[in-house]
Amino acid sequence: ALQRLSAVGLVHTNGRKGTNVARLTMPQLLDSFLVVSELEALAATQASKRITKEQVSTLWTHQKDCEKAFSANNPDAFCIANDLLHGTILKVSGNWMLQDYMRRTLILAPYRRHITFQPGRMEASIEEHESFIRAIESGNGLAAATCMRGHVNALADGLSDFLYFLDQTGLSEIIASKE
């Protein structure tokens, strides 16, 4: 299990020092969000060309689950529904290499989760989801990519608020120091 986690970058094995949860430096974190933004934009573009009516229905179901989680003020349920929504788009893209690269971005999950908990982020995500789902549904790859890129970049924009939160709560150790 640790080898699988290490393969996707979620843990680092340091010989006799043992295995530790991976932490990203600030430049690595910013670079990672930039790459994820482009990968998800590509997934949205390809999904807009390949999606079926049943898959569109699945996207809207996940979106409704996000709305319910927001209404219930349940960020955990929101994160699950959000992951299912994004995962469905990735699957619909049908691009095995893109799917493989996206698995490598699992290292960002804890950071994305903390950003999602920031005030106003869930509500904004719901509106952003509707925009890229409509674009995918209509087959407009350019609009789908633009909307998705904006959605993921909004997470990176929320990074400064997240960093302030970490500093104020004393949780800044989840960010790696330069080595």
Predicted regions located by residue number:
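Short linear motifs at protein or domain termini
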Residues: 1-45, 49, 160-179
